[in-house]
């Protein structure tokens, strides 16, 4: 069977949350765990759009908190595919605080490894990724390097057992 290919734009996702008092930690900033849930959901949406089935989060790389978000801030979360394997997909998620004037500044970045699952919760093949821009090709190369590092870390952990 010939592999189907989809573009990065086919699966992009963006969502907006308003930070409410129940989302705040003791320092009156957005609780990191809440943001992690939100970005995991966006990564899942991107991956589901690409593979057309269920997905699970396998790992999160480089989860970086750059700045805080506060009550009444609009938090914009954008996700896109950067790399795909046979059953796994890397999703880059960027998070911004948006001002009432529409200006955005990034507060978080993360890379999620998502795995497509069939009806028996076993990994299933995913469509390939058709790269259309120089930025997409560069993101793919960076995704390949992150994958190589993940595989080396896994090998090192297994060797230590």
Question: What positions do the PLM features span?
Answer:
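Terminal targeting signals and extreme-terminal segments of soluble enzymes
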Residues: 1-161
